[in-house]
Amino acid sequence: MRIGLLAFAVAARYVEALPVASGEEVASSSAPTTLPSTSSSSALPSPTKYTLPHEDPNPEARKAEIALKRGGFLYGPSTLGQTTFYPSGTLGTAMSQRDQALWLRDAENQTITAYREANETLRDIQSHGGLKTLDDFALLYDGHWKASVPEGIEKGMLSNYTSDLLFSMERLSNNPYSLKRLHPTKDKLPFSVEDKVVKQLTATTLAALHKAGRLFFVDHSDQKKYTPQAGRYAAACQGLFYVDARSNQFLPLAIKTNVGADLTYTPLDDKNDWLLAKIMFNNNDLFYSQMYHVLFHTVPEIVHMAAIRTLSESHPVLAVLNRIMYQAYAIRPVGERILFNPGGFWDQNLGLPATAAVDFLSSIYAHGEGGFRAGYVENNLRKRGLVGDTFGGPALPHFPFYEDAQRVLGAIRGFMQAFVDSTYGGDDGALARDFELQDWVAEANGPAQVRDFPTAPLRRREELVGILTHIAWNTGGAHHVLNQGAPVRASGVLPLHPAALYAPVPAAKGAVASSDGLLAWLPDEVKSVEQVSLLARFNRAQVRDRNQTVRNMFAAPELLAGNGEAYAAANARFVEETGRISREIEGRGFDSKGLSQGMPFIWTALNPAVNPFFLSI
């Protein structure tokens, strides 16, 4: 079936006229009720067979279609800070409006459910007299949020929240993007810790740990430049971690606040002081992770935009990209309207204001984050000394993120390898004959300004496999480690991970007389329920029932019908492999030492049978 070019233009005018909800209002059924999953426009029917340009029996119509898209789908200014371009032009605006309508409709049930469960939870907490101790935070979760967060919070996250091992291993699971190993000669020690303290904790010196490649660092000191909202407070923590030579565990060594008296805390301090230090650190880390994750939106977006402008809707590569970029262009404008707007959900819950969050995103992009190939998992982790060349230090004894990511990535790469091989007949030379593909690579390196994209011409199928694998990993893997259901289930679980602090950073140690004294820094029952409710709305509990999980990533009927038997066979293998991964993750328990993957909590953030295949929030 030939793409209807007139239909594309008509769709642009139609979708552009769709009402867009304000605040939490959800778009009604004015949006189309069914949307082809492999078309750049809601009114573009998918071809019955996808073809490469040199095999298309109607090349002139194909060229005209691309010309129409290039004229109406344009690179507009970045939204939500200064990162990559955002769609503009008649067709670009139409796609944005369509995706926003889709997103708002998908979010409706989750939002209604989370609000209902929030009210029920608050009533239950108040019936117990409120949050009077740290352990009372269990009331936030016990028996609640069963519809909006059906998997519940990660096992061990509440029962072991005081554990130093839990705190340190969060850097290798909940947020693996802020940690680096300090190079013994290229990196200086970021701050000092008393020799006798280091000796007592590690049986060696700080310099020796550094020289041996056993010292790791997280730096949130740049958050110091932002002013917290009235009545809220924030540190700007730096943290040192190490691989212990005796226990072979990854453990915390020290936390420096960088504000006020600029105290440095260690595990040898009073247990309540040290727990407060970990809470302050996690508050900074939650801010970091929620804004860093936006790069997992912007990077695939700009590559997809370049593809829309250069590939025909009949091209099999664009068909796959359109599938995995489902509703992708909703997030930035919706975020601006209801999350990062003045007084919006961010300001209602976080310590630092939304203006700081958006500035932070712009800042990390301006300083080089968001490179395409630099974001490949192996490249990213190697650069930070976490895998591969470990700067002469020992390998991490456990790295849960990497362990699970390797498996999910392997399944995605296996599918993409089979897809590319079947599309190009196992012939690298066929890439050169695909002038649309080569135009895409040139466009990405040119007008789209994609950072660190493979250069034109693309000569090897393996390069294309890498590109497609990375985009699919961003939408179905990396994003969900930091966002989606991960914050409500792990990285935002109270009391260890408050979105804001409600008392000043201490000017001296000994400020916390008892564990219950920590409540002064933590949200009360109302703000606690609001935090959980917001994070619950990030989750997408319905995708499993709707067959929209990572396991279904490539299973769109149009793709199965239009790409032939080899594609269908590759999809079947992918479904089988991701099923095995999911069963293993869901079957995890604690070993005889009370650990799972070396951690005192069970991490499930990369479960392909739970996560959406798309950029959900």
UniProtKB/Swiss-Prot annotation:
UniProt keyword annotation of Secreted present: yes
Biased composition (Low complexity): 23-48
Cofactor: Mn(2+)
Glycosylation sites recorded in the entry for this protein: 109, 119, 160, 547
Top-level enzyme category: oxidoreductase
Example GO BP: linoleic acid metabolic process
Entry's Gene Ontology molecular function annotations: linoleate 11-lipoxygenase activity; linoleate 9S-lipoxygenase activity; metal ion binding
Gene Ontology cellular-component terms listed: extracellular region
Subcellular location(s) of the protein: Secreted
Stretch forming the signal peptide: 1-17
Domain Lipoxygenase: 122-617
Cofactor note as given: Three His residues, the carboxyl oxygen of the C-terminal Ile or Val residue, and a fifth residue, usually Asn, ligate the metal, which binds water to form a catalytic base Mn(2+)OH(2) for hydrogen abstraction.
Catalytic reaction list: (9Z,12Z)-octadecadienoate + O2 = (9S)-hydroperoxy-(10E,12Z)-octadecadienoate; (9Z,12Z)-octadecadienoate + O2 = (11S)-hydroperoxy-(9Z,12Z)-octadecadienoate; (9Z,12Z)-octadecadienoate + O2 = (13R)-hydroperoxy-(9Z,11E)-octadecadienoate; (9Z,12Z,15Z)-octadecatrienoate + O2 = (9S)-hydroperoxy-(10E,12Z,15Z)-octadecatrienoate
TM spans (from-to): none
Enzyme Commission number(s) from the entry: 1.13.11.-, 1.13.11.45, 1.13.11.58
Keyword terms, alphabetized: Dioxygenase, Glycoprotein, Manganese, Metal-binding, Oxidoreductase, Secreted, Signal
Known role: Lipoxygenase that metabolizes linoleic and alpha-linolenic acids to 9S-, 11- and 13R-hydroperoxy fatty acids. At the end of lipoxygenation, the intermediate products 11S-HPODE and 13R-HPODE from linoleic acid are then transformed into 9S-HPODE as the final product. The intermediate product 11R-HPOTrE from alpha-linolenic acid is transformed into 9S-HPOTrE and 13R-HPOTrE as the final products. 9S-HPOTrE is further oxidized by the enzyme to 9,16-DiHOTrE as the end product. Also acts on gamma-linolenic acid producing 9-HOTrE(n-6) as the main metabolite.
Record-stated family: Belongs to the lipoxygenase family. Manganese lipoxygenase subfamily.
PANTHER family: LIPOXYGENASE (PTHR11771)
Protein name: Manganese lipoxygenase
